[in-house]
Structures are given as structure tokens and as C-alpha cells.
Amino acid sequence: MADELRIAERPELRRPVLVTAFRGWNDGGQGASLAAGFLAKAWGASKFADIDPEEFYDFQVSRPHVSLVEGVTRKLEWPENAFYHAHIPEIERDAVLLLGIEPNTRWRRFTSLIVELSVDLQIDLVVSLGSLLADVPHTRPSPVTGSATEQRLIEEYGLQGSRYEGPTGIVGVLHDACRNAGLASVSLWAAVPHYVSLAPSPRAALALCQRLAGLLGTHLEADELEQAVDSYSEQVTEAVAADPDTQAYVEQLEQRADELGPQFDVPSGDTIAAELTRYLREREEEGDGHPEGP
């Protein structure tokens, strides 16, 4: 096993599925990372391994964080990509959850480590969660689209296939690495309203969790997420109502959503490229920011 993979224990797993989510460009409104974090909590997941961040991050961009423990001791936290294992209720299989951060460098090596561990654990399906900005209203359920390494997977899991072409993130690179290794892989994408892109989107997280549960054939109690969705919707609605132009725009999106149902228009390659440029510019500004303390 590669040195970059730090494995504390090897769990005994039953027909495991790997579920991944990465903070960063593939995590609009933090929908994917919120979903994965909720699943880890709901399923009682336990950490068993991680990836050494040393070779995969520019620490001037993805800086480590210092925090105080009991008001005295300083704790240093590095960018983390951690693997957790959990039993999935109601079905005879287990889950491996990878909660991480999109790396800055060496994406092919990074994804090869994930594939290597997947093969070692005899994982037979990889499901990557993502969330993207789209022309959807905050008052309706987040539509979910998907892609897969094989046409049979799209048909088997009833995915609404994506025809997107353009820039990609670590989810797309992992998807390709799985295909090259002969590992079945599916990606699920929830739509996040672009006009509230900076706010965490529990609605997107809920849609991803529900779609994943349906794909796996299990039931998921999501009362906590549903309550967060209600609060999110109320707060955004109040903010939107303060601007008549935005209110009118949202009403147009609502009308279109009601007509189209669960489908939505995936942004074009040019739109995604513009979003990538904006994201990278914001990351650069964050990396160049002055620290508040030593």
C-alpha cells in the first residue's frame, strides 16, 4: 500500500460502497460536503484512514488552521481527506465515506490512491457527490442529475444522464480513474441556486442524501436536514423579498421549475469556466490574505 495512505485499521466490510465528497469547486453551496457529513453522523461512521496532505496541497492556498484547546494548547489542523466506515441500515452492505478537500496538485496520483484503497477493500461501487450552481429556485427541491462509467449503471440506477462538456474538478478526474481501473462509478449532482451560492445549501444536501439512499435501497431519517431546509428557505425568501427585481426573477424560476419538474439545465462549459475563474480568484485572494495571528 502506498506511503501516502495512512491506515490505522482495516475494517471488515460487507459489499462496501465508497461515497466521496470534496470541499472546493465541486461543492457549490457546500451541498456535497454537508450531505457526506450528515451521512457520516447518521450512520455512526468511524475514521480508519486518511491521505497524507504533504504532496497534494499548496499550503499558501490551503492553509493549515490553528485552534485553541481548552483555551491554552494550540492544535494544528492540516487539510484532511479522511476515510470512515459505517454499516448502512436495512441492507446487507457497508459504506466507506471519503470526506475531503479538492487537492491543489497531483490529481492523478491523488485519485490513484483512492482507487488503490478501493480495490484493496473490495469496493464494488464508487458514488461521488457534487453540487453545482444552476438556474433553480431555492423554494423547490434541488434537482439531481448523474453520470456513470457505464450505460448499464445509468439504466440500473435510473439516473438522469448529464451531457455536460467543459472544465472539470476532482470528481471528474476520480470518475475517469475509476473507469480506467474497471471500477463501477456513479456521480450525483444537486443543483444549487446561483443567486445564493455563498450560503450553505441544506436543500442540495437533502436531495443528494435522498437520491443516494434510493440508489442503495435504504431508508434515511433526515429530520435534521429537513428542519435546516425549512430555516434556509425562510431566510432566503425574506432576503429575496427585499429586492423586487430578484423577487420577480425567482418567481420566473419557480414557474419554470414547476413546468420542467425534476429536470434542470446543466450550465454550459463557458459558464462553468467562468465560475472556475471566479472560484480560483477567490481562493487566490484568500491565500494572499494577511494572517490574524502567528
Can you name each region flagged by the protein language model?
Residues 49, 96-98, 127, 184-189:
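Hydrophobic/aromatic beta-strand patches that form the interior of the parallel beta-sheet core
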Residues 135-215, 219:
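Catalytic cores of processing enzymes, dominated by hydrolases/peptidases
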Residues 1-100:
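N-terminal short beta-loop-beta anion/metal-coordinating cradle
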Residues 22-26, 98-107, 157-165, 195-199:
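Flexible, glycine/proline-enriched loop segments at strand-loop-helix junctions
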Residues 93, 101-152, 174:
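Internal, conserved structured core segments that host functional sites
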Residues 30-34, 105, 109, 165, ...:
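Conserved active-site and cofactor/substrate-binding residues in soluble primary-metabolism enzymes
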Residues 196-294:
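A conserved C-terminal secondary-structure "cap"
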